[in-house]
Amino acid sequence: MKAITLLSSGLDSVAALAIAAESLEIEMAITFDYGQRAGQREIEYSRKVCEHYGIEHIVIKLDWLAGITNTSLVNRGEDVPALSFEDIDEAAPAAITEASAKAVWVPNRNGVMLNIAGSFAESRDCDYLVVGFNGEEAGTFPDNSMAYVEAMDNAFSYSTQNGVRVLAPLIELGKTEIVKKALEVKAPLEYSWSCYHGEETPCGGCESCVRRARAFKNTGTKDPLLERLGV
């Protein structure tokens, strides 16, 4: 069976690709450029990941999405929230992570990306779209949830002739479990970029960096990306 993967080069999308590649033929990977701060870094690292797996890589620009997004993931005039391990703990007030999610939200981003990728999947007669949706982020990002996957599958049953489906191999996993699984399948995590910023090295303070750091700490392993960068 064949699949197309949505690849941002983040921990989750790289792990999902690595897992899917064990049982599916990955036809291509799509990276979206919607003006995000880390866009060029994501494109660079996604290209490296695709070279590792020997798969086709395309980049789709969504300038119009950048134009209507006012939150800090795209708008350089807004500050990206900085969080700590305590802020993302289950005992912490939910309002902290909810505010962080709101600050980096991009209007209907996953819906737009999945529908574009669905067109490619149908045109190439691919069965699946592989995504990095996971259990840890589903609480604050509803478009990472199983309910959303099922809703998209239902929509694709109407909008694609071959019934493209969304495959989310991490849907029940937290970040710690994702790191363990990624290491197990030898995912090229040295070229996975999670940071909301696009500097030479990860900031270490945005929510994505903090969740990644906690996951590696919990597994007792060093982050291959930081090792490669000498951080």
UniProtKB/Swiss-Prot annotation:
Full protein name: 7-cyano-7-deazaguanine synthase
Pathway annotation from the record: Purine metabolism; 7-cyano-7-deazaguanine biosynthesis
UniProt-listed InterPro entries: QueC, Rossmann-like_a/b/a_fold
SUPFAM superfamilies (alphabetical): Adenine nucleotide alpha hydrolases-like (SSF52402)
Record-linked Pfam families: QueC
Residue numbers binding Zn(2+): C195, C203, C206, C209
Primary role: Catalyzes the ATP-dependent conversion of 7-carboxy-7-deazaguanine (CDG) to 7-cyano-7-deazaguanine (preQ(0)).
Catalysed reaction, written as an equation: 7-carboxy-7-deazaguanine + NH4(+) + ATP = 7-cyano-7-deazaguanine + ADP + phosphate + H2O + H(+)
Source organism of the structure: Methanosarcina acetivorans (strain ATCC 35395 / DSM 2834 / JCM 12185 / C2A)
Entry cofactors: Zn(2+)
HAMAP family named among the record's database cross-references: QueC (MF_01633)
Lineage top rank: taxon: Archaea
PANTHER family: 7-CYANO-7-DEAZAGUANINE SYNTHASE
E.C. number: 6.3.4.20
CC cofactor note: Binds 1 zinc ion per subunit.
Keyword terms: ATP-binding, Ligase, Metal-binding, Nucleotide-binding, Zinc
Coiled coil: none
Enzyme class: ligase
GO molecular function, one term: ATP binding
